[in-house]
From Swiss-Prot:
Binds 1 zinc ion per subunit. It comes from Thermococcus kodakarensis (strain ATCC BAA-918 / JCM 12380 / KOD1). This is Small ribosomal subunit protein uS14. One of its GO terms (molecular function) is structural constituent of ribosome. Zn(2+) binds at residues 21, 24, 39, 42. It comes from the Archaea.
Amino acid sequence: MAKADYNKRKPRKFGKGARRCMRCGQYGPIIRIHGLMLCRHCFREVAPKLGFKKYE
């Protein structure tokens, strides 16, 4: 086997590295409710435009 064969990885099926933010491409805290697939930073920016309201 060549060294290049060791660098190929299969795609992740679960965990933090399995999903990316659809807006910025960041891995990590993804909000998946209603199929949003946004990280929490992007969600905070676009939530009012999507119709989400912040209650105290």
